[in-house]
Every structure is written in structure tokens, then in C-alpha cells.
A protein has these predicted regions:
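Catalytic-core regions of glycoside hydrolase
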Residues: 294-297
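Acidic/aromatic-lined carbohydrate-recognition and catalytic surfaces
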Residues: 1-192, 199, 203, 214-288
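Active-site-proximal substrate-binding groove within the catalytic cores of carbohydrate-active enzymes
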Residues: 301-325
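Generic recognition of flexible, low-complexity loop/linker segments
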Residues: 14, 196-197, 240, 303-305, ...
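Receiver (REC) domain switch/active-site residues of two-component response regulators
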Residues: 207
Length: 325
């Protein structure tokens, strides 16, 4: 769209537009904040009056009720939950935000889809091409080998990394919840189609793509299937695509891990990956300081952050929907 190309051109002339300290962000659930996307439009004056110029809308794409993981089990990357509105409503909202100098962020859940996604439904029905988009197995032999080295994300509420599907006599990889099927990025169709979905959202006016659970997107037997080199290759490719197609859009990586594992997601000066990463450690250290009334840990951590190259841009935040740990 022409208005978005104009934004791209403006940001290309000022590539450091997001690196200052003049961006104040707000996270919100559409239904809790204003009921619908139309309701958010009607509250933009209030948002602006708070000094907010960065609006992170929590997951609002179509996902099955009762099996949506807060919207992180996406059934269709090109439809909004009906109770919140439509894709056209989203486009209108982002356009109004841009008129008021507000950038818009949306989660891009790239590790998995809902079991209700069209690909998953076809895979469950036996389509071999659709099954190749996920990790399907006839028995537990290979899944059990994965389990020997792969940590569990939710060992209490969703133990294991695989789920048995009795209706089709198959085992499928489900790192998070049983209704979230992991995508197989070794299949180039998956990468191509998911990047196409990402670009669809940028054409809806999304300025910041939050790459959800990015360390998990590549799996390999005999490893923890976290932070593997192929993950960085995929993120680097996404960065290259975005710089060509939508150069004004930022990639924000969600890497909730210790600092040594977070920094590599910036890439390098000549081969950049994410534009921004969450400053997870500072957030946790801030709450530790409040609880202990001891600034020592926070001071040491901030000294480490300030010693990093200027090219590294962190999104500093106080809290989010995830736990503090």
C-alpha cells in the first residue's frame, strides 16, 4: 500500500528511528481494553494522551476458543478473531495509529500452528504434503529419542514434547501444548509460506513483528532443539526479506533466556538478525531490586548492557503477559 511505502521511505532516511529513548510502549488485550478493534480506534485519543507511541496488541488472530493459549495457537494467520473484528478493522486501526504517530506491534507465532489450522487439518486427514509441514511419526521410536535431550516447556501442565493422535494413529511434536503443532522449517514450503504470512501482516500496517518463541523453531535429534545455528539462519533470512519488501518494519525477537543466549539474536553488524530484543534480565532484576531493596544485581546487569555495541537495541519493559522468571 502507498501509505506504508511512504513510511518505509521515511524510515530508510533515518535508519536509527527506533534507537532513541522517545518511544513509550503499551501492551493491551483488545477485548479487555476496548472490546473490539473498533473500540480501540475510539480510544486512540486516550492512548495518545498517555504519551504512548508504540502499541503492542496482544494476539488477535483467529484461534479456537478453549484451545488458544491466549491467542498463541493460531488457526489462520490472515483472519482476526470474529469477536474482535476483521482484517479490515485491523488495517483501519493501524492507519489511524500512523496518523497519530503510533507504531503497531503484533505477535507472529512462528514455531507452531493450532491443530485447527488448515495445514494441520489436512495433515490429520492423511495428506502427506501437509504432514511434512509438521513432525509426524508412526510410532514413539524417534519421539522418545528427542525426549532424551529436549527439555520440557510445561512439565506439569503439558508434559512431554509429543502428542499421540488416536484418530490418525500418529505421533506429532507439540513442544508447548498438545493443540499446538510444531512446524518443520526443514521443509522450505513452511518457511516460504510463513514469511508470506508475516508480509501479509506488515501489509496490514504492522510496524513491529514480534517473533514469538524464536529459539525453538529448529529441531534436531541429539540436541536440546533450542538456539541451534539454523535458527539464526532462518531469522537472518527473514531480516533480508523484510529489508527488501518492507524496510520500515522491525523484527523484535522474543528470547526469554540468559543474556549469553540472547545476544546472538542480534546477529552481527554485517549480518544482522533481529532489530530489537527484549531486555529480559533488566526486567527481572528490577523486580528483584524492589523485593530486596538491593540495587547491586541491577547495577551489575546495567553495566553489562551499557558496555554492549550501540547497534544492539533492547526493548526495556516493566512487565508482560509471561512470568517474571
Amino acid at each position: 500500500p502507498v501509505p506504508l511505502r511512504k513510511i518505509d521511505r521515511k524510515r530508510e532516511k533515518n535508519p536509527g528511528w527506533y534507537k532513541g529513548n522517545d518511544i513509550l510502549g503499551m501492551m493491551m488485550y483488545t477485548d479487555a481494553f476496548a472490546g473490539t478493534l473498533q473500540g480501540v480506534k475510539e480510544k486512540l485519543d486516550y492512548v495518545k494522551s498517555c504519551g504512548v507511541n508504540y502499541l503492542h496488541m496482544m494476539p488477535l488472530l483467529e484461534s479456537p476458543k478453549g484451545r488458544d493459549d491466549g491467542g498463541y495457537a493460531v488457526a489462520d494467520f490472515r483472519k482476526v478473531k470474529p469477536e474482535l473484528g476483521t482484517i479490515e478493522d485491523l488495517k483501519e486501526l493501524t492507519s489511524l495509529c500512523h496518523e497519530q504517530g503510533i507504531s503497531c506491534c503484533l505477535d507472529f507465532v512462528m514455531n507452531h500452528t493450532s491443530e485447527d489450522h488448515a495445514w494441520a487439518k489436512a495433515a490429520r486427514a492423511g495428506d502427506p504434503q501437509a504432514r511434512s509441514r509438521y513432525f509426524f511419526y508412526d510410532n514413539w521410536d524417534i519421539p522418545n529419542k528427542y525426549e532424551e535431550t529436549t527439555p520440557q516447556v510445561f512439565p506439569t501442565t503439558a508434559p512431554g514434547n509429543f502428542t499421540w493422535l488416536p484418530d490418525c494413529n500418529q505421533v506429532v511434536m507439540t513442544t508447548f501444548y498438545p493443540y499446538q503443532w510444531d512446524l518443520n522449517y526443514a521443509n522450505c514450503m513452511v518457511f516460504n509460506d510463513m514469511v508470506d504470512n508475516m508480509l501479509f501482516l506488515t501489509n496490514c500496517g504492522i510496524d513491529v513483528i514480534r517473533l514469538d518463541a524464536v529459539p525453538y523453531i529448529w529441531k534436531e535429534l541429539g540436541t536440546k532443539s533450542r538456539n541451534l545455528p539454523q535458527v539464526h539462519t532462518l531469522v537472518r533470512m527473514m531480516r533480508l526479506v523484510s529489508e527488501i519488501v518492507c524496510p520500515g518494519v522491525l523484527l523484535l525477537g522474543e528470547v526469554v533466556m540468559e543474556p549469553a543466549k540472547v545476544l546472538p539474536y542480534f546477529g552481527s553488524v554485517d549480518k544482522p538478525e533481529c532489530h530489537m530484543l527484549y531486555n529480559v534480565t533488566t526486567m527481572a532484576s528490577t523486580w528483584n531490586t524492589i523485593a530486596t531493596k538491593d540495587v547491586g544485581l541491577l547495577r551489575r546487569q546495567m553495566d553489562q548492557v551499557c558496555a554492549l555495541p550501540n547497534e544492539y537495541v533492547f526493548l526495556n519493559y516493566l512487565r508482560c503477559h509471561d512470568d517474571i522468571g
